[in-house]
Amino acid sequence: MMITRNFIGVLALCLCALAACTSSKESKKTLTVLSWNVWHGGHSKTYSGKGCEVTFDILKKSEADVVLMIETYGAAPMVADSLGYSYNLISDNLSIYSRYPIIRKYAFADSISTFNFGGVMIDVDGKPVRVFNTWLHYLPDMRLAPTDKSKEEILAWEMEGTRDEEIHKILSVLQPLLAEADSIPIIMGGDFNVHSHLDWTEATRNLYLHGGAVVDWPVSIAMEEAGFKDSFREMNPNPVANLGVTWLTDADSLETECRMDRIDFIYYQGKTIQAIASECYDNSLGKTFTFKGEDFFYPSDHGFVLSKFELD
């Protein structure tokens, strides 16, 4: 009788543990985020009449829960209507679309222009998540990076522009929210218009037209030092095997050989969020793009980043 009681007790404990484990798994939510510079709102004169519609089609095919759009330029209402999502038009340039309710909007116009930065808080089935969209200045042009120079000269060239100043302003205004990131996770993506130190390594110095250079690009260093993780590089840690090109997708239309690299990112931070998948889609402007088994005309000069996260 005692053996039977002990067995029943052990069985009950096992069932409770199994139920707790199952409940924990079921309580985790996934959130898929897409970041894309759609090139003049999808209505560039280069491909007049094609870009908008196919941009919407690709976004729908992605099944992203959140879309960070750069170079929105008039497309926001049509994108939101096409997806059936809530949206926040931060500026003519930046917009965010969400399958989940937007419960707060963020702008820091006194410190950083809304043309460069802004965000929202969304409610993912009771779990708040802060999401920010970013655009840093395109000059100095990454295509012209003097990779035949010393590391110091390359960094001096980069500092001639405003990207370093912009990212530090952004990180400064985010400080109070970063302090809460372990309870309310933060996702920050967009078009940073600059390379990453995680891509310009000793292993890649003689690849991808890097010209032998190993460069600690300041913007990605600043993001890392602020506690952000690069979702794509975390999921694809070998830049030799997968550089993750997002620019220039129209490189083969240029008269001279041009460096193609990763300048679009999705970063994240917080104890209750973890990247579980990420891909960069480096596609050629104006060419056929096969995505999830379907062919599309590709409308942008940027590829896009698609990252999937798990929320505790």
Predicted regions, residues:
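His/acidic metal-ligating clusters that form di-metal
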Residues: 159-192
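Structured beta-strand-rich core segments of catalytic domains in phosphoester-bond hydrolases
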Residues: 66-145
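Metal-dependent phosphoester-hydrolase catalytic domains
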Residues: 176-186, 194-312
